[in-house]
């Protein structure tokens, strides 16, 4: 019996050792296929690379040395950065279902209602249902056109405001941002919120804090960092303010009979869909509030940011400014109402917009997460890997773009590339299943105001400033706004 017991122990120990060796061999084999990465430090990994630099800039530098599929260790979090059109295509088309998830973060979890929205929602039945409602009921091209008179009225108000400046500099970024917020408010709620300024400020702060680079997000196992996170408490205070604004409005909205245009606004549609028989996943109040916050984030904040970047680039390139103004003024001459379809026919204006989006995409880094282990460009991507698709770097890659850092709208006359998710060298709105569902709404909120601003005003820099003085610095955060607002002197254009 003693011999049998000894044999059993030996067999168990041998089995354990063999199992360890096999697992180590498998791990070693798997690691041989992992993406390359720079040398990392204990505990922090590659976080020191991000000190003092914007993530999209740092990640491009890493890609230039280690390739378009590179591993970065962000604290405890294993991450991979994709920095080429080919790698982006693998993640957003070939393997799209596997990369359709979003990773978790304090910012998105707190301000977007436990990710019960569309932008940050996991890839699940709730997301599929909400996206279908968004595309077919809320922000379809037909509905976007129906909001046209709202845009026109608010643009006219903006033009009157700018025209009364009397030759003084105007904070164009601030005024365009206010206009964009009013357009979204009226389209979503059928009226202007009395607290819309506070809501717009909450959107800006939330986008700055939702990038996924908060220390508590990078060390998820550390209860101490989570406890001591000042941004977590800041976000919780912001969430309470947001609830106060939206809860009060939704309660009032339930009692009114119709939207301002005699039919349904976006919130009316969501209320109706709540009661629909074909709704499989309940649409909660948090879901509605999350969608409203999505609409402000992607429909107002990014639209005003894109217009600011476009005007800044045109001010630095007077010949381009003259060319696009000549096109707009010839096409819109004598018209009091500007239709979206007319603006979309202005080829050089569309090229200016594309070039602006190439250099300054609304979301420089598109966040994803792998659902299962897979392979991209020959490298193994483990399950639950945090993915960053560096849209900013792809848009400035000399492999796809000649003189990539130069603002040259004419390049889109030479090469046909669009931003609808089919040309992976140019994906400012993403691609695949998670391409921006409000793309048409956002574009309309950029193209028409930009055309009107270029038509009605000649623009000058404030006295003493030159083109070289324009600050083109980006700020950190999920979106990529300018560090400094655009302040210009508008002069009303008088048609000959």
UniProtKB/Swiss-Prot annotation:
The reported result of mutating residue 357 to M is: No effect on regiospecificity
Give the membrane topology.
Single-pass type II membrane protein
Consequence of substituting residue 359 to M: No effect on regiospecificity
Per its Swiss-Prot or TrEMBL entry, what cofactor is needed?
heme
Annotated Gene Ontology cellular components are: endoplasmic reticulum membrane; intracellular membrane-bounded organelle
Pfam families, A to Z: p450 (PF00067)
Q: Which transformation does this protein catalyse, written as a reaction?
A: (4S)-limonene + reduced [NADPH--hemoprotein reductase] + O2 = (1S,5R)-carveol + oxidized [NADPH--hemoprotein reductase] + H2O + H(+)
Q: Where in the cell is it found?
A: Endoplasmic reticulum membrane
- What InterPro entries does this protein's entry cite? CYP450_71D, Cyt_P450, Cyt_P450_CS, Cyt_P450_E_grp-I, Cyt_P450_sf
Residues given in the record as heme binding sites: 436
Function, as annotated: Hydroxylates (-)-(4S)-limonene to (-)-trans-carveol, a precursor of (-)-carvone, responsible for the typical spearmint flavor note. Fluorinated substrate analogs are hydroxylated with the same regio- and stereochemistry.
Q: Which family does it belong to?
A: Belongs to the cytochrome P450 family.
Protein name stated in the entry? Cytochrome P450 71D18
């Amino acid at each position: 019996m003693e011999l049998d017991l000894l044999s059993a122990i030996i067999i168990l120990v041998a089995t354990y050792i063999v199992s360890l060796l096999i697992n180590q061999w498998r791990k070693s084999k798997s690691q041989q296929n992992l993406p390359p990465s720079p040398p990392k430090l204990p505990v922090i990994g590659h976080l020191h690379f991000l000190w003092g630099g914007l993530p999209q800039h740092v990640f491009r530098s890493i890609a230039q040395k280690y390739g378009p599929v590179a591993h970065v260790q962000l604290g405890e979090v294993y991450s991979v950065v994709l920095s080429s059109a080919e790698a982006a295509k693998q993640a957003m088309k070939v393997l799209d279902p596997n990369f359709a998830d979003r990773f978790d973060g304090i910012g998105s979890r707190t301000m977007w209602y436990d990710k019960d929205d569309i932008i940050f929602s996991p890839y699940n039945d709730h997301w599929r249902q909400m996206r279908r409602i968004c595309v077919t009921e809320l922000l379809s091209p037909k509905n976007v056109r129906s909001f046209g008179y709202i845009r026109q009225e608010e643009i006219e108000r903006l033009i009157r405001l700018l025209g009364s400046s009397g030759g003084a500099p105007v904070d164009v970024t601030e005024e365009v941002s206010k206009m964009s917020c009013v357009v979204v408010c009226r389209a979503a709620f059928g009226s202007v919120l009395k607290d819309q300024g506070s809501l717009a400020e909450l959107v800006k702060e939330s986008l700055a804090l939702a990038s996924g680079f908060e220390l508590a997000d990078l060390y998820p196992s550390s209860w101490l960092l989570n406890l001591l996170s000042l941004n977590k408490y800041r976000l919780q205070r912001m969430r309470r303010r947001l609830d106060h604004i939206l809860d009060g409005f939704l309660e009032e909205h339930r009692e009114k009979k119709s939207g301002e245009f005699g039919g349904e606004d976006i919130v009316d549609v969501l209320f109706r869909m709540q009661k629909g028989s074909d709704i499989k996943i309940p649409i909660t109040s948090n879901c509605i509030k999350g969608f409203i916050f999505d609409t402000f984030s992607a429909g107002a904040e990014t639209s005003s940011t894109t217009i600011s970047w476009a005007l800044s680039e045109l001010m630095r390139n007077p010949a381009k400014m003259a060319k696009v103004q000549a096109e707009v003024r010839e096409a819109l001459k004598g018209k009091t109402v500007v239709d979206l379809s007319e603006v979309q026919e202005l080829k050089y204006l569309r090229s200016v917009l594309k070039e602006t989006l190439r250099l300054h995409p609304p979301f420089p880094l598109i966040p994803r997460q792998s659902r299962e282990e897979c392979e991209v460009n020959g490298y193994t991507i483990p399950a639950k890997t945090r993915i960053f698709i560096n849209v900013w770097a792809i848009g400035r890659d000399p492999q796809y773009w000649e003189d990539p850092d130069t603002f040259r709208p004419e390049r889109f006359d030479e090469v046909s590339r669009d931003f609808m998710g089919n040309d992976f060298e140019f994906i400012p709105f993403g691609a695949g299943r998670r391409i921006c569902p409000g793309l048409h709404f956002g574009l309309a909120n950029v193209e028409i105001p930009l055309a009107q601003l270029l038509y009605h005003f000649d623009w000058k820099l404030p006295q003493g400033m030159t083109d070289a003085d324009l600050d083109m610095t980006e700020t950190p955060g999920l979106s990529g706004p300018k560090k400094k607002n655009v302040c210009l002197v508008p002069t009303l254009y008088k048609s000959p």
